[in-house]
Regions:
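Short, conserved loop/helix-junction motifs that constitute active-site signature segments
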Residues: 103-113
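Short alpha-helices
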Residues: 119-187
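Short glycine-rich anion-binding loops that position phosphate/pyrophosphate groups of nucleotides
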Residues: 29-30, 94-97, 122-123, 240
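Glycine-rich phosphate-binding loop
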Residues: 87-100
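Short acidic-hydrophobic, aromatic-tinged amphipathic segments that line or gate anion-handling sites
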Residues: 72-79, 133-136
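Hydrophobic helix-and-loop "lid/oligomerization" segment in the mid-to-C-terminal part
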Residues: 2-28, 34-68, 80-88, 170-334
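A short helix->loop->beta-strand "cap" motif at the edges of active sites that frequently abuts
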Residues: 48-50, 111-115
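Short glycine-/acidic-enriched loop or helix-start segments at secondary-structure transitions
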Residues: 34-35, 99-103, 128, 287
Length: 334
C-alpha cells in the first residue's frame, strides 16, 4: 500500500473511533469474502464497544454459519430500520452501489451527518464513498482489511485470523487463482500462526459442495469445447440445463457460488491461455466469466468489448444475447 492508502486507513479508523452508530454493509447474496469482511468489522466494533448493525441482503443462513459473527449479520433489514440513525456506513467488498440494497439511501444521504467508508478489491464502478480504500491488485477484500488492521496496530486475534483466512482462501480458489501473490501466502501463513482453523474452513468451503453443484459441474464439463485458434477453453450452461437441475434438486441460483466454482475448475485445464463460461439467464441475457493465468493477457480487455470488466486475470460480463449450439461447438449471438 502506498502512503495515500496508509493515510486513508488511518483516517477510516479515526472515523470508526468517533462513530456513535455504525452500519456495516456488503453486497447482496454475499460470498465468504464478503461475510468474512463484515465479520471483521463486527469484531472491531464490538471490541470498541460500538453500537452497530450488520447487513448483507439475502445472506444464506446455513452455508456460512461457520464464520465468526455470521449469526449477527442480518439478511433482511429489521423492522423499524432507519438509515438516518447511523453516522458511519462501512461498505465492504462491493464496488457497485446498487448491490448494497441501499443505493437510494447512500446517494441521497446527508453527507454532513452520514460518513461512508468503502473497502474493496474490485475495479471501481461507482464512487459513492467519502473514503474509498480500493486495492484491485489484492486477492480479496479481507486482504485489504488485513492491511487496514496492521496500519492501525490492531491485534489480530483468533476470530480475526479465521475470518481473514476464510476470505483469502475462497477468493483465491485455495491459492489457485492468478490473484494469489507471495504476500497473500505470507498473510495466510501468519493467520495460521494466529489461530485460524484451517481444517474447519476447508470442511465448510472446499469440502461442502451440494448435489446441485456437482450436477452443474458435470454439465459444464460435458459442454466444454477447445478453441485451438485462440487457445481458449469455452463451456456453456443453457437456461434449460440450469432449470432442469433446479427442478430436480433445487437450489437458489442467485445465492449459489457454484458458477464461480465451475470457472475455477475449468481454469485447471492445461495448455489453454484462458477459459470462458457462458450461462443463460431467464431474462434473455447471458453472463460470462473469464479467467486467464497467462502473464501476457489482460482478460478484462476482452470482457470490456461486451460491456463487462474486472481484473486483468478474472473478469465478467452481462449482455443480451443467446447461445446457439453448432456441430463443432457453440456460438454466442448478441
Amino acid at each position: 500500500m502506498n502512503e495515500e492508502y496508509l493515510n486513508y486507513c488511518q483516517k477510516a479508523y479515526q472515523k470508526i473511533l468517533a462513530a456513535n452508530n455504525i452500519l456495516i454493509v456488503s453486497h447482496l447474496h454475499p460470498d465468504v469474502d464478503a461475510l468474512s469482511s463484515v465479520g471483521i468489522m463486527i469484531e472491531l466494533a464490538e471490541s470498541l464497544d460500538k453500537k452497530y448493525l450488520a447487513y448483507a441482503s439475502d445472506k444464506d443462513e446455513k452455508i456460512f454459519d461457520f464464520l465468526p459473527h455470521s449469526e449477527r449479520i442480518h439478511s433482511k433489514l429489521p423492522i423499524g430500520f432507519s438509515f438516518n440513525d447511523y453516522d458511519l456506513v462501512i461498505v465492504l467488498d462491493c464496488g457497485a452501489i446498487n448491490r448494497t440494497g441501499l443505493a437510494e439511501a447512500l446517494h441521497n444521504r446527508n453527507k454532513k451527518k452520514i460518513y461512508v467508508v468503502e473497502f474493496d478489491h474490485h475495479p471501481p464502478v461507482d464512487h459513492f464513498a467519502d473514503i474509498e480504500i480500493r486495492v484491485p491488485h489484492l486477492a480479496s477484500a479481507t486482504e485489504v482489511l488485513y492491511h487496514f488492521l496492521k496500519v492501525n496496530n490492531i491485534t489480530i486475534n483468533k476470530n480475526l485470523s479465521s475470518l481473514l483466512l476464510s476470505g483469502i482462501l475462497t477468493d483465491t480458489g485455495n491459492f489457485l487463482y492468478p490473484s494469489t501473490s507471495d504476500e497473500t501466502i505470507n498473510i495466510a501463513s501468519e493467520m495460521l500462526r494466529s489461530g485460524a482453523q484451517l481444517p474447519k474452513i476447508f470442511q465448510n468451503t472446499l469440502q461442502n459442495k451440494n448435489l446441485a453443484s456437482m450436477k452443474l459441474w458435470g454439465l459444464a464439463l460435458k459442454n466444454l469445447k477447445l478453441n485451438s485458434k485462440y487457445d481458449l477453453a469455452v463451456s456453456v450452461l443453457t437456461k434449460e440445463e440450469i432449470a432442469e437441475v433446479k427442478n430436480e434438486v433445487g437450489f437458489d441460483e442467485a445465492s449459489s457460488d457454484v458458477f464461480g466454482d465451475i470457472i475455477g475448475l475449468l481454469g485447471n485445464l492445461g495448455g489453454m491461455k484462458g477459459v470462458i463460461l457462458f450461462r443463460e439467464e431467464l431474462d434473455g441475457r447471458v453472463k460470462a466469466s473469464l479467467r486467464t493465468s497467462d502473464p501476457e493477457i489482460d482478460i478484462s480487455r476482452l470482457a470490456s468489448l461486451f460491456g463487462g470488466g474486472g481484473h486483468p486475470k478474472a473478469s465478467g460480463l452481462l449482455t443480451h444475447g443467446k447461445i446457439i449450439q453448432k456441430n463443432d461447438g457453440w456460438e454466442f449471438e448478441y
